[in-house]
């Protein structure tokens, strides 16, 4: 039986929710804590830093309105998850419970708060997600990745940033170097399953409109869906160097090497681009819940580190004009790269762990603001 203090982190079973939880877990273990993960079945595909005995599956479900039978099932699963959470906490006796978004966080964090345990939530996006909104009034602190100031919760909201991979921090040491008129211009295009199809249609049309001398310089790295892999042949026929694939193991290297990026605006993407310091054209996913990607993009654009364009407004002519401009005026991209880097928060994992330890020892919220988060004080 370990004598270490136990911390339970709770996250929905997708990479976006799990990664910051895992990053914090690694840091807290180095500080001597025994860290457990409460999540749902989906997490098994993504978890890297928890062994089986430290993973606890909790029942939950996404709230579905206007469907009575689905609503009944959802409430039953939430109730079951609350009972499971209560039993788990009785066994582990955690000194801290932290939620990282997604509906699976609701039962454990709710029960933890209800039973008087110290709690926090971490919001990755500039707009608070639905599960975190349910929990915001009940927790002791709200850690902000990109979250815009919310006057209702300002007294307990702390800007920590979003934890990123160690590879991102290493890539951040590589300075941005503008592409001169005789050098290749690296253009990175990615958007996951939510962006690949739209980008695969627009980018080659834009490339066709470029002058020959610019096409000769262009080196495209583009994420596509599996059925769109023949895009490589289209670029080849236009005389453009291109790497096309559904997934890149070395995506961090591609971000660091790029002169210009076109991507969606998920929280992790925006944070990684900012920390490495690369200029971007951000196209928010139009069907994102609560328009969180638009808010994420707006935060970086407001500091001059990115340009936003709605998908409905993007066409081949506009993209072609942008590529021509940036190939001919590389120093404007240098300025955007510097602006993006100023937004990045490479110390996010450490700051989040500092906040967690402050909560554990009972530090007041005001003291925590003064010491760690002066930039969030109004």
Swiss-Prot record:
Molecular function GO terms recorded: UDP-N-acetyl-D-glucosamine:N-acetylmuramoyl-L-alanyl-D-glutamyl-meso-2,6-diaminopimelyl-D-alanyl-D-alanine-diphosphoundecaprenol 4-beta-N-acetylglucosaminlytransferase activity; undecaprenyldiphospho-muramoylpentapeptide beta-N-acetylglucosaminyltransferase activity
GO annotation, cellular component aspect: plasma membrane
Acyltransferase among keywords: no
Pfam families: Glyco_tran_28_C, Glyco_transf_28
Reaction catalyzed: di-trans,octa-cis-undecaprenyl diphospho-N-acetyl-alpha-D-muramoyl-L-alanyl-D-glutamyl-meso-2,6-diaminopimeloyl-D-alanyl-D-alanine + UDP-N-acetyl-alpha-D-glucosamine = di-trans,octa-cis-undecaprenyl diphospho-[N-acetyl-alpha-D-glucosaminyl-(1->4)]-N-acetyl-alpha-D-muramoyl-L-alanyl-D-glutamyl-meso-2,6-diaminopimeloyl-D-alanyl-D-alanine + UDP + H(+)
Topology with respect to the bilayer: Peripheral membrane protein
Pathway(s) the chain acts in: Cell wall biogenesis; peptidoglycan biosynthesis
Coiled coil regions in record: none
Entry superkingdom: Bacteria
InterPro entries linked to this entry: GlcNAc_MurG (IPR006009), Glyco_trans_28_C (IPR007235), GlycoTrans_28_N (IPR004276)
Record's keyword terms, sorted: Cell cycle, Cell division, Cell inner membrane, Cell membrane, Cell shape, Cell wall biogenesis/degradation, Glycosyltransferase, Membrane, Peptidoglycan synthesis, Transferase
Location(s) in or outside the cell: Cell inner membrane
Protein EC: 2.4.1.227
Keyword Cell inner membrane (UniProt): yes
HAMAP family xrefs: MurG (MF_00033)
Functional description taken from the UniProt entry: Cell wall formation. Catalyzes the transfer of a GlcNAc subunit on undecaprenyl-pyrophosphoryl-MurNAc-pentapeptide (lipid intermediate I) to form undecaprenyl-pyrophosphoryl-MurNAc-(pentapeptide)GlcNAc (lipid intermediate II).
Entry protein name: UDP-N-acetylglucosamine--N-acetylmuramyl-(pentapeptide) pyrophosphoryl-undecaprenol N-acetylglucosamine transferase
